[in-house]
Design a protein with these regions (language model features):
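Lectin-like carbohydrate-binding module/patch detector with strong preference for beta-trefoil
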Residues: 487-627
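Carbohydrate-active catalytic/glycan-binding domains of CAZyme proteins
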Residues: 1-490, 527-531, 570-572
Length: 627
């Protein structure tokens, strides 16, 4: 909490966080406050649905064990009125249609019912099955009425994630169903997964982290979300994908209508979507911006909006005073049971989370520091036993603890969580002067799990391990450093490069015969040297050092990628940035990718639909500057 995050955008690319639907759970249940040995990790807000109708905003969501909740506001910034909706309705979509309110829900067997105007409960006798089990339809429904037809966007995760569309002339059916996107992982494989029985993971519990199959898609496919139209008639999808230990992320994907179906992707490559494409044409001129203000010096009267507590906080035991965040310690056996733990989602692909910690007011048994709320959890903090002050590193997988002697000046030190979320690992560090950081403990493996479904969440915490109320910790100057946020230098404009295929680790060569092929790693002739020439708006052509250009003929099969002396015949590509010098080249007009099979011995083609999860199907490259 706060819960149900509301963001706003005028261009579907640059978003601003503007409100939450509620500040705290208002159920009379101690579990939502982490009291009495009860907890609700991962049991809060599920699958929200936002709608606008007749001047009001509506958000519908499920809370496990509490049923369907509705939040209503005249202004998207709030305040929001809370209504509890009776009935067994979950993972729903809402459709306002002809003065009626329909709720569509269920997995496999999809049901629809009409809700009463006050949203108190379904209209008796209206609940019925509209899509039977056995049609391949899953859950996560989004219902739309477009040009008189009813379209239901849904997802399935058995055996892997994909997005489906069902359509009918009547909301009650019958429906026909097709897949509108599958296998679009953007070249990302699944990450490590925590395998553990039960709910909250207590210290000493046997925890297994299953390492991923790099060739599988699993739920790294873009697979669940909704669609939206722009004022000029473009259609776009916003779908989520499971993205390693970072948790679930949102993809913006173009839609192409064909035969009355909203396929994800572009006309020449339906079902797959580009990693980089032209912005939606909404007519709004918006400067690039980050959706969240992650840094917090705690000088304000309120916390930055991005912060969320792990459960309902005890507001009497935390405060903002003197430009610092004060968290008073309460009894807890370990981090996951610690109340008033303040968290925000980790940001990838790499980031360093740093905070300044004042330990002068800790008491016997207090533990305070910087951690990662996940299962398993980890932390680096100061432990006070009697008059002894030690720095302690802890990771829950092996119940490992490492203690470090420290002598912080004026009772102040700095803690860092240095996370590499692309490679699912992190290193804790500490500093006694705020600038020179020393590794603490071992590098830890970061994982994803299906208890909270949220991935890694850096957190600030203070608790007492000896079962009593303790002192308090003061936190200051929280900041998140994102070394790869500036992508302006990622495309090697003005550089002479070699194009190395990740599948074979071999460079491309413009052969004398006129086709593009691979060559030995040691071949550094000019025929292996290329320049990317900017033609505007993310588009480019590729020129060899001998003056020829890459072109594509026919339907782009192997051998159709050739060399030409005529710049006007050069194939126009759109650069697909994968960071760390890795990239793809998508034909701007064909919507398929430059590729060379790593196994057949064929020359280059431009007919690849997209990368595989391991980036080893011959469509992903790495550029090297020619010295």
């Amino acid at each position: 909490v706060p819960g149900v995050n509301i963001l706003h955008s005028k261009d579907l690319v640059n978003w601003e966080q503007i409100s939450y639907c509620f500040d705290r759970f208002d159920f009379n249940d101690p579990a939502f406050s982490l009291v009495g040995g009860k907890e609700v990790y991962g049991q809060g807000v599920w699958a929200p649905c936002i709608r606008y109708n007749k001047g009001k905003f509506y958000v519908f969501t499920n809370v496990n064990g509490k049923g369907l909740q509705a939040y209503i506001a005249d202004d998207i910034r709030g305040p929001w009125k809370h209504v509890m909706v009776k009935g067994n309705i979950y993972d729903l979509s809402i459709l306002f249609d002809d003065d009626k309110i329909y709720a569509i829900h269920g997995y496999g067997s999809v049901r629809c019912c009409e809700l009463k105007p006050d949203l108190s409960e379904p209209v008796p006798g209206t609940d019925r099955e509209i899509i039977p089990e056995g049609t391949g339809v899953g859950e996560g429904h989004h219902m739309y009425k477009i040009n008189g037809m009813y379209y239901l966007i849904s997802t399935d995760y058995k055996p892997n994630g994909r997005t489906l569309c069902s359509r009918s002339k009547s909301i009650w059916g019958p429906y026909e169903t097709i897949t509108i996107t599958a296998d679009e992982t953007y070249g990302y494989h699944p990450g490590p997964m925590t395998e553990v029985k039960g709910r909250i993971v207590d210290n000493g519990t046997h925890i297994k982290i299953k390492m991923p199959n790099h060739n599988a898609t699993a739920c790294t496919n873009a697979h669940q979300g909704g669609i939206v139209s722009t004022p000029d008639g473009q259609w776009w999808a916003l779908l989520m994908q499971d993205f390693h230990s970072i948790g679930r992320t949102v993809d913006l994907m173009p839609i192409t209508w064909k035969d009355g179906w909203p396929f994800i992707g572009l006309e020449g490559n339906l079902g797959r979507a580009p990693r980089t494409w032209e912005k939606p044409s909404t007519g709004a001129k918006v400067e690039p911006r980050a959706p969240y203000q992650r840094n917090d010096d705690f000088n304000g009267k309120t916390l930055q909006r991005i912060w969320q507590w792990n459960h309902n906080p005890d507001d009497k035991l935390w405060s903002l005073k003197g430009g610092k965040l004060r968290i008073e310690s309460m009894p807890a056996s370990q981090l996951l049971w610690a109340r008033n733990t303040l968290t925000q989602r980790a940001i990838g692909p790499v980031s360093q989370t740093i905070v300044e910690l004042d330990i002068n007011n800790l008491k016997d048994g207090d533990v305070a520091g910087l951690g990662n709320i996940n299962m398993p959890c980890s932390w680096l903090g100061v432990v006070k036993n009697g008059k002894s002050i030690k720095l302690q590193w802890f990771q829950q997988v092996d119940n490992d603890t490492i203690t470090i002697d420290i002598n912080p000046k004026k009772g102040k030190l700095w803690l860092m969580l240095d996370g590499d979320y692309d490679n699912d690992c992190a290193q804790y560090k500490y500093s006694l002067n705020g600038s020179d950081f020393i590794p603490a403990g071992n590098k830890i493996t970061l994982s994803y799990q299906l208890i909270t479904f949220q991935g890694s969440r850096p957190c600030l915490f203070a608790f007492n391990s000896k079962g009593k109320r303790g002192g308090y910790a003061l936190f200051d100057n929280f900041k998140v450093i994102e070394p790869k946020a500036d992508r302006s230098q990622n495309i090697p404009w003005g550089k002479t490069i070699r194009i190395i295929n990740l599948a074979t680790n071999l460079p491309a060569e413009a052969t004398r015969h006129g086709v593009l092929y691979d060559t030995s790693r040691g071949n550094n002739r000019p025929s292996t040297h290329f320049r990317l020439i900017d033609t505007g708006n993310g588009k480019l052509i590729v020129q060899c050092a001998d003056g020829r250009y890459i072109m594509a003929s026919g339907i782009g099969m192997p051998g159709d990628v050739r060399m030409t002396n005529d710049e006007a015949q050069a194939e126009v590509f759109m650069y697909q940035d994968y960071l760390d010098h890795e990239f793809m080249l998508m034909s701007y007009n064909r919507h398929t990718y430059l590729c060379k099979s790593p196994t057949t011995g064929s020359p280059y083609s431009v007919d690849c639909k997209g990368p595989d999860p391991a980036r080893k199907n011959g469509s992903v490259f790495k550029w090297e500057v020619v010295e």
